[in-house]
């Protein structure tokens, strides 16, 4: 099964334990498995590796852009929705090791979990094969997103888009519900779910309520097949 994932990213691991670590959600150990490993440390590294590769690509290929524009484009390319989109492209959720509770709650298709796992996977490639190897993987997986961002065609107002889709389906009214606030006051993460009636369409998180609502709407659009 892991071989199939390696084929998806066009990279074969020399150290399979790195790949397994990248695929292990923290809930796996929390539910009594005899393993303390999770992908959280790799996720930390992968965030920086991805940022470096995309920064380098933009710097070398868009000499017309000033620092502010470079930062803006990079943020669009490496954001959670983009990472989750790449994860779905390679069916990453189906390979994750996670606790039953997390799986039952829809963890395999949750943007935040997919994005974190994607960063962990990139870090694993970096540690296993070096910068050139992970550069190839990133630029291949993110090619469509990079092109769309640079052409200005990425649709980032997901709430408006979801509203349009739901209205056309005539299935009811959308509501957004703040379900959790994580962390201290100076560094809060907000978790929001978007619903039609009692049916949860998507869950998202962000550093503001608005950002978490956009993330929830984006996940809903992905599940509805509007975003791929």
Swiss-Prot record:
Family: Belongs to the ribonuclease III family.
NCBIfam families per record: RNaseIII
InterPro entries from the UniProt entry: dsRBD_dom (IPR014720), RNase_III (IPR011907), RNase_III_dom (IPR000999), RNase_III_sf (IPR036389)
Protein's name in the database: Ribonuclease 3
Enzyme class label: hydrolase
Subunit description: Homodimer.
Function: Digests double-stranded RNA. Involved in the processing of primary rRNA transcript to yield the immediate precursors to the large and small rRNAs (23S and 16S). Processes some mRNAs, and tRNAs when they are encoded in the rRNA operon. Processes pre-crRNA and tracrRNA of type II CRISPR loci if present in the organism.
Keyword list, A-Z: Cytoplasm, Endonuclease, Hydrolase, Magnesium, Metal-binding, mRNA processing, Nuclease, RNA-binding, rRNA processing, rRNA-binding, tRNA processing
Main localisation: cytoplasm
One function term, GO molecular function aspect: metal ion binding
SUPFAM superfamilies, alphabetized: dsRNA-binding domain-like, RNase III domain-like
Top-rank lineage group of the source organism: Bacteria
Alphabetical GO biological process terms: mRNA processing; regulation of gene expression; rRNA processing; tRNA processing
Positions that bind Mg(2+): 43, 116, 119
Pfam families: dsrm (PF00035), Ribonucleas_3_3 (PF14622)
Stored PROSITE patterns: DS_RBD (PS50137), RNASE_3_1 (PS00517), RNASE_3_2 (PS50142)
CDD domains per record: DSRM_RNAse_III_family, RIBOc
Keyword Glycoprotein: no
GO cellular component, one term: cytoplasm
Active site: 47, 119
Catalytic reactions of this protein: Endonucleolytic cleavage to 5'-phosphomonoester
Residue span(s) of domain DRBM: 157-226
